[in-house]
Amino acid sequence: MSTQTTKILVFSHRPEVRETIITAVGRRPAPDLPRVDFVEAGAIADVLYEVDNGTVDLLILDGEAQPTGGMGLSRQLKDEITNCPPIVVAVRRKDDRWLATWSQADAVLVHPLDPLTAAETVADVLRRVPVVNG
């Protein structure tokens, strides 16, 4: 049995949004992938610290976070970080998916989160990239 894990950072200024995302994705988004360890970030500084240290395999950013939203943060990270980890942005409305595309996000989740869709989306993104934290 493998002891490898995948580290996912979940960013939102609201703890209940982070919890909703974590619950929807689950600790094992797919049987062929390692278990997930979640890191919660409530501030931009926390996200930047983890990304700068290269310790996360995937970021899930709340598009509605305040004062800086996940879409703007995604765009900044993709523009400024070499080998930026993949990013999934969670938006409130389906109509906001185009903004997530602008943000260079690798995938989009739409609230209310469906656990099957959330896990499948995250699994698809994780399958495209090597795990760096394991």
Model region roles, listed by residue range:
Residues 57-78:
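Conserved phosphotransfer microenvironments
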